[in-house]
Amino acid sequence: MLLAEIISVGTELLLGEIVDSNAAFLARELAARGITLHRKVVLGDNLKRLAEGLRTALARADLVIVGGGLGPTDDDLTREAIAEVLEETPTEDPALLAWLEGLYAARGRPMPQVNRKQAWLIPSAQALPNPVGTAPGWFVRTGGKIIVALPGPPRELQRMWREQVLPRLPLPDHALFAVTLHTQGIGESNIAELLGDLTKAANPSVATYARQTGVDVRVAASAPTAEEARALAAPVLDTVRHILARWIWGEDGDTLAGAVTQTLGGRTLGVIEAGSGGALCLLLADQPGFLDAAVTVDHARLITLGLTPVTLGSVGVVSEAAARELAAGAREHLGAEVGLAVVTATAGEQAGQAFVALSAENAENVAHVNWPGDPAQIRERAAVAALALAYRTLRLPQPSGKAGHA
């Protein structure tokens, strides 16, 4: 079994100024290939601590992936740390230096002298070309172990991982098969209760993860071959699908917006948002069938979109009645076959309150959610609640009634 560790380098990561999306990407990539990730570490731009971290990782892992610290400045120290740990001296590689100078020449600029360190190599390192940046990576074999050093910008790291690193990695001795089921409308603890002892098994394993769009359930199995891993996971996967059938909206790379589009069955969708700042439109932007939208908190504009003055005066915008009227208004005033509305408040006494409603020819529904949080969280949760309501209603049409809970 190939064991891996990830070291993310950068004081800005350590201080929380930048989110470490690289480690999340690499973790998913390793899992998909049956490589076991044991640890993820964040280290600042300090040569001593980087060297110590590398020594520790090499003592317990077969593959160490270092992200960041390959820039041209004095605080980019990944190359120096690897060289120190392996007791090798970096030297300028003529081919890398010529490549770097060519990049700057193509831009009509001379190469700054500080960039020369990006042409360094040690004897045990192979340079990894960077097609979208100036920092080559390193692929190092030492004592039966592998060190991979990649630049920090995600666009560079991800492309180099796929094009340069994966072809060089040894194949794992076991194959992994995994499927992630996406659910909505049920909490993580409720899922755990329903699944019972299934979550205690090691192979196949069943794990739950809370996400913005609901709760994910991952079923994974490992075996000597891909076919054996799939066969091992199949009965457990079927059981989980059966238990959670009423809440599952998709699998693996599916999106909730995409699932809603499927339930539309070719019908057009119109959206009215009041208070959510276009969060719902952002989720739907690339979906076919998304016809039109109105995003506003202006009362006069909302009245032209279907909100009645009576409702505005009696219960206000953030109300079940307003959501229902605006969902119907999305059909009437935006010309859509299905109308979806979200009304929410991100501040004041009603902060965190949201009503979402759907109106279609043969289906209407409304739901109420109350999730306190910062304004961005409130907007995102309201938008997801609207999509969840649309999916449930359009998949299994139900009579309209009082507001439920999304």
UniProtKB/Swiss-Prot annotation:
Gene3D superfamilies: 3.30.70.2860, CinA-like (3.90.950.20), MoaB/Mog-like domain (3.40.980.10)
CDD domains the UniProt entry points to: cinA
Record-linked Pfam families: CinA (PF02464), CinA_KH (PF18146), MoCF_biosynth (PF00994)
InterPro entries: CinA, CinA-like_C, CinA_C, CinA_KH, Competence-induced_CinA, MoaB/Mog-like_dom_sf, MoaB/Mog_dom
Entry similarity comment: Belongs to the CinA family.
HAMAP family per the UniProt record, alphabetical: CinA_B
PANTHER family: NICOTINAMIDE-NUCLEOTIDE AMIDOHYDROLASE PNCC (PTHR13939), NMN AMIDOHYDROLASE-LIKE PROTEIN YFAY (PTHR13939:SF0)
Protein name: CinA-like protein
Source lineage: Bacteria, Thermotogati, Deinococcota, Deinococci, Deinococcales
